Structures are given as structure tokens and as C-alpha cells.
């Protein structure tokens, strides 16, 4: 049975794990890393780069290198979050025809779901290389506070990457699985998850294989990227004060600042102070300029104080919604790389009144939890019951622009809820169902998930027709809504499926493109391997001829081998993989004669050496005997005679 992998698709880094021998194991990438940077780039040759290779070239190619795409997925171009990001991101974000956003890389537009699919395809390939078999099924994690459109867009990304996404699971819930799988006693835990781009807090009751989420809250636009930007702004401001040059206007310099800011932030988790040195950061008429700034932990904490303050309210709301007080929480589990920051840990301690639990690896625990959930779905992990919740309330717009909630936030999923509504005017022939997600009282202040019409309602006074609206949330947290005229039985439904901004046709086309790209990558890899093999074979053969001595090979054999070498050298410069392999095989066959000649030469030399040594000793013995040096003669003579 093919394995199902667990993927933590992160803002900054992604991680993949799989169940092996009853335990979840993180799969290392080809560079040996246990996490892969969530970065995609298109280089000047039009080649797509993913992960570490994309990160390495980001400084020289900032406009065509995408990072932090998770903060954009499932969002509209005009949303406040996207408008904020446009001001600080080096790559171009444009408005799509349907109001969604597109990322422009080398004059080609990509949706955030498509960019995410490139990361997922790379992770899928890593897993396949490790497992030695094709991987199609996966469990992918998302922030608990992701909206329906963000979840659907993530699922679409998986589909484009060639994955069958069995389940979308919330990151804190996945982390709780990894933490609590072997715990026998009942515990109330809070999972505090601060990652590269998102913040989640979930309160759960766990024990004896049951993981019940009581409440969840968060901010899908708060994370390490925001902390980095504060440091970047500080460095740019200090440099401008000192040199009069604004580095924010130089995208290459800005990318160097970003990398330096991220590194400094990490160093300050273990050191009270760090030096930021960026030689040749820019230049003016007087020559090159260098940046050298000291940054203390205290200064960093001052720069990000308001971001740290933002973490308190979601925690307080989650506690209130769960029905528990902070003192009733047994453990606070830290998840996400940003929780290594001492100031974050101090805030957690202040909010919950206890030191946080650091027993799990914050970078890997979510992927491990996803792999455990994959094991549950596959039947490899038994006696685990996961009861997750919907993070936001769901409802429809009713008379006066009010949002009427059908499903309250923190309702256990999957769930289904119906309510009967009626018409607002006499003889109303149709009703428009405006599906909403959010906590505000007025429809305009909540997020629109979709709209659909139920038509052909028989003429009747207002308030008479009975329209039953049903909300259905599946285990992935994805919503389907239907409206039924109870009088006629006529029904209309909507599954919120185009939330990634991509139609079914567009997704199918992208799936085909991804498959073609995978085939192209495979062919490219085979060509490079064939060229490398040919290179090594040519080198080895030419070296062997030189070692043997050209006079030791008969002319016909030498000419045949030389001709094969020349043919292979020419083929090696082409892109014909089959021809390179064929000529490599032919040169290998021709080289067998060379190997025979070398073996014969080695045998002859061995025999000559053996015979020659014996003769020399005997001769030496005789002449020395004449010289009367008996002791030496006897010893040498006996040794040679043996």
C-alpha cells in the first residue's frame, strides 16, 4: 500500500514526514535539510527553482523570487493584508480579472495556489526519492484560523502538484497529535503557534487517544516576516541617517537587509547582542558603502513590542471560548520557529501564568502530526479520535444587511445545520443567498464566501415561502451550502470551490502543466546523469590508454576505442539522452579489450618482477661469495631460493 505523507506547508519553511514502523519520521531534502525554504524563483533562463537553490539566488534576483506566499493565498487583491504586503514585497502583485491577485514573474502571471503547488511538488519529489515509490496521497496542514477560501486554495495547490489531499488539518491540532499521542493521562493544553507568517492559538482536551479542540483563535497575518520587517526598517533608517542613502529604494540591497534581519533575529534568541555587517551594500559618487550596525536583544524587543502585544487578545478569546481559565491549562506547547524568541516565551508565561512546554521541536512537530493523521486515515495508527472545530462563524445575509449565523465558531466538524427563511417581498420570484464567514454583526464587515440564487419561487405573499438553507462543513473545514424551497422541492447549492481564484478548468490545465513539467524535469535529470556518466567514462578510458602505453595496444583496437571516444564526446554536447547512453554502452564494450590488455600487461610485469628479483639475488650471491662476504651471501641466497 502506497504511503500517505504529512506536509507542513509553512510561510518560511516547509517540512514533510511519514509513518515508518509505527513512528512519524521527518524526511530530509536532497541538501540534507529537515525543512525546505518555502521559496520559488524563476531565473533568467526561465528555469523554475524551489527551496534552498531559490533562496541562494534571491539577492541577485529579488523581483522574480517569491517568499511568504502563504500570506497571500486565498485572499483578494483589494484586501487590507494584500495592500500592506504590496508595499513591502520585492516581487510584483497584480489584480486578476475576478478580483483575486496574481504574482508576476518574468511577465507571466501565477496565482498564489500555483506558487504553493511548486513547493508541494518539490516536497512530493523529496518524499518519492526517500520512499522509492510514487506518492499521491497527502495530509496538508493550514493555520487554524485560515478561512474557507484559504483552505480551498491550499487544497487546490495540492491538486495542481499531483497530490490527492486526503485531509486539510489545522496546524495546532497536528502539533497536539505529535505531543499527545503517547500521553495516557487527561490534559488540558494550549498550543501556541507563532510561525513565519501566521499566529494560532488552540485550546484542547487530550487523553486516551481523544484529541478534542475546544476553541481556536489567531491572526493569519502575524508572524516572523513582520518581525523581520521591523528590523529591516530599523537598519534602513539607521543607514539613511548615517549615509543619506535610502536602501529601501534598492531591491537588491533590501533583499540583503531582509536576510541579515532574519539572521540577526535568530542570533538574538541566544545572544544579548549581534553585529550586522553588510559590506558593499550600495555605492555613491564617493565609492562603495558598507553597513555595520550593532543590534541588541533589548532594541529588537522594543522594535516589535506592538507585535508581541497583538498575541494576547487571541489567547484570551480562545481561553474564554473554551470555558477554561488560564490556571486550568496543564501545558502550553510552543510551535513555530518564532517561539524560540525569549520575548515571545515571556509573553506566553505572562498570559498563561506558567512557563511554556518546550518538549517538541517547533519546526517539525506540525509535519509529524500531519504524518500521524495520515497514519490514522490509512489505518496504520489506531485508537486516535480527532475532534476539530471550525474557526469562524458561518451564516447568510438577511434583511437589513445583517449576518444571521447558522454555525457558530468553534463548532466541532464535520457538521451540518439547517434553518428556514422566507421572502422579504410579495411575489418574490427568487432569493439570493449571500454566504458569509466571520464574527461581525453586519454582513458587509464579514468575508464573502460566495453567492447563489434560488429561482422560480411560486408567487406568494412575503413570509409565506419556506426556504431551507443548509450549511455543511466537511472534516477539512470546507463549506457547502444549499437552499431548498420546501413548497416545490426545488434546490440549489454551492460548494465554495473557486476560492483559490481558479476555475476547475484552470486547475485541470495547471495539473497537466505540472505533470508535463515533472516529465520535463525527469528528462533533464536523465540527460545530466547520462552526460556525467559519459564524461567519467571518457576520462577513465583516456587515462587507461595513457597508463597502458599506446604501443601496447594493437592499432585496430586503439582506432576503434578512439573513434568511440570522439563519437561520445560529440553526442555529450547534444540533448539526445538515448544516443549518449547508446554510445556510452558501445565505448564500455570497446573498453573491455583495453581492460584485457591492461590485465595482461599487469600479469607480465608481475612475472618479470618476480623472476628478475630471483635472478638478481642469485647473481649477487655468487659474486659476493667470491668476495668472501659469507654472512650476507647465505642470507640473501636462502631468501631468494625460497
UniProtKB/Swiss-Prot annotation:
One of its GO terms (molecular function) is unfolded protein binding. SUPFAM superfamilies: Actin-like ATPase domain, Heat shock protein 70kD (HSP70), C-terminal subdomain, Heat shock protein 70kD (HSP70), peptide-binding domain. Residues 594-642 are annotated as: Disordered. Keywords: ATP-binding, Chaperone, Nucleotide-binding, Phosphoprotein, Stress response. InterPro entries: ATPase_NBD, Chaperone_DnaK, Heat_shock_70_CS, HSP70_C_sf, HSP70_peptide-bd_sf, Hsp_70_fam. It holds the Pfam family HSP70. Residues 602-627 have a biased composition (Low complexity). The modification Phosphothreonine is found at residue 198. It comes from the Bacteria. Induction: By stress conditions e.g. heat shock. Residues 628-642 have a biased composition (Acidic residues). Belongs to the heat shock protein 70 family. Acts as a chaperone. This is Chaperone protein DnaK. The lineage of its organism: Bacteria, Pseudomonadati, Thermodesulfobacteriota, Desulfobacteria, Desulfobacterales. The gene is dnaK.
